[in-house]
UniProtKB/Swiss-Prot annotation:
Coiled-coil regions listed in the entry: 29-281
GO terms under cellular component: chromosome; synaptonemal complex
Organism: Macaca fascicularis (Crab-eating macaque)
Region (Disordered) residue spans: 1-31, 261-313
Subunit (UniProt): Homodimer. Found in a complex with SYCP1 and SYCE2. Interacts with SYCP1, SYCE2 and SYCE3. Interacts with SIX6OS1.
Family assignment from sequence similarity: Belongs to the SYCE family.
Location within or outside the cell: Nucleus; Chromosome
PANTHER family: SYNAPTONEMAL COMPLEX CENTRAL ELEMENT PROTEIN 1 (PTHR21731:SF0), SYNAPTONEMAL COMPLEX CENTRAL ELEMENT PROTEIN 1-LIKE (PTHR21731)
InterPro entries assigned: SYCE1
UniProt-recorded name of the protein: Synaptonemal complex central element protein 1
Biased composition regions of type Basic and acidic residues, renumbered to the chain: 295-313
Domain of life: Eukaryota
Role summary: Major component of the transverse central element of synaptonemal complexes (SCS), formed between homologous chromosomes during meiotic prophase. Requires SYCP1 in order to be incorporated into the central element. May have a role in the synaptonemal complex assembly, stabilization and recombination.
Length: 313
């Protein structure tokens, strides 16, 4: 800018030399001032440039440091991302494992619950079976006692002494009925003989006798004798039939007694086996109580009860 002004001033006209010299002096002073100003500006610019260079160097240093730090942070970020990815994968695996464990625990809990229910059902079934066996045993014992009582009554009924007494009583009743029948027959014969003698006698009969024979009292007497004779015959027939029925019943009862005796022997064996199995179930393994066999008096009582049962039937 100062060079262009000097070049423009170097072309003065000849008429203005003096003015030019004056102006040149002024220009020189102004140029000096401008040069000083320019120098000052240049110095300031250089100082500013130097300062700017220093600031730029510091900024570059800071930028490099920040870049390095950024690179470090970026690397750390990548590393942290890798760690996060690994942790997430580990967490996913752990969650899956936890879900599997929970599913397994739920399944085991379900199986355990089913086992408990089955155990409860089996325990209830065992208890019901025990109660059923106990009831069957009690019913069998009651039936056995009843059979023993019937057998005892039958034995009492079929004792030889009692049978002999009953047969003697029947024979005596039969003889008594026969005697009564003979007596009634004799009485009837006498009455008939008297009637015949009265009806066939020669000579006139008295009026009273004729009236008596034709009266209702004579007819009633004859009818009474006939009824007595008929009743005696019926009693005799009933006694004979009763005696025959008693003998048949005695034979039937003896046969039934034999059958019941065989049945009691079979049932005694069954009771023995059932009692032994029940005692084994109640006592448990290793503590089985040996059942007591029936003694001779008990067997005799059993037969007596069976005979009583047959008698009542």
């Amino acid at each position: 800018m100062a060079g262009r002004s000097l070049a423009s001033k170097a072309e003065p006209t000849a008429g203005a030399m003096d003015g030019a010299e004056k102006a040149e002096g002024q220009d020189t002073s102004s140029q000096k001032i401008e040069v000083e100003v320019l120098i000052n500006r240049i110095n300031e610019a250089q100082q500013a440039k130097k300062k700017a260079n220093e600031d730029l160097g510091e900024a570059r240093t800071i930028c490099e440091a920040l870049q390095k730090e950024l690179d470090l942070l970026h690397g750390e970020k990548v590393h942290l991302k890798e760690i996060l990815s690994k942790k997430q994968e580990t967490l996913r695996i752990l969650r899956l494992h936890c879900q599997e464990k929970e599913s397994e625990a739920q399944r085991k809990h379900t199986v355990l619950q089913e086992c408990k229910e089955r155990i409860s059902a089996l325990s209830l079934q065992i208890e019901e079976e025990k109660n059923k066996q106990r009831q069957l045993r009690l019913a069998f014992e009651e039936q056995l006692e009843e059979l023993m009582g019937q057998h005892k009554d039958l034995w009492d009924f079929h004792r030889p002494e009692r049978l002999a007494r009953e047969i003697c009583a029947l024979d005596s009743n039969k003889e008594q009925l026969l005697k009564e029948e003979k007596l009634v027959k004799a009485t009837l014969e006498d009455v008939k003989h008297q009637l015949c003698s009265l009806c066939g006698a020669e000579g006139p009969s008295t009026l009273d006798e004729g009236l008596f024979l034709r009266s209702q009292e004579a007819a009633a007497t004859v009818q009474l004798f006939q009824e007595e004779h008929r009743k005696a015959e019926e009693l005799l027939a009933a006694a004979a039939q009763s005696h025959q029925q008693l003998q048949q019943k005695c034979q039937q009862l003896q046969q039934k007694r034999q059958r019941l005796k065989e049945e009691l022997e079979k049932r005694g064996m069954q009771v023995h086996a059932q009692a032994q199995s029940t005692q084994e179930e109640e006592a448990g393994p290793g503590d089985v109580a040996s059942p007591k066999p029936l003694k001779a008096p008990e067997e005799k009582d059993l037969e007596l009860h069976t005979e009583q049962d047959l008698m009542s039937s």
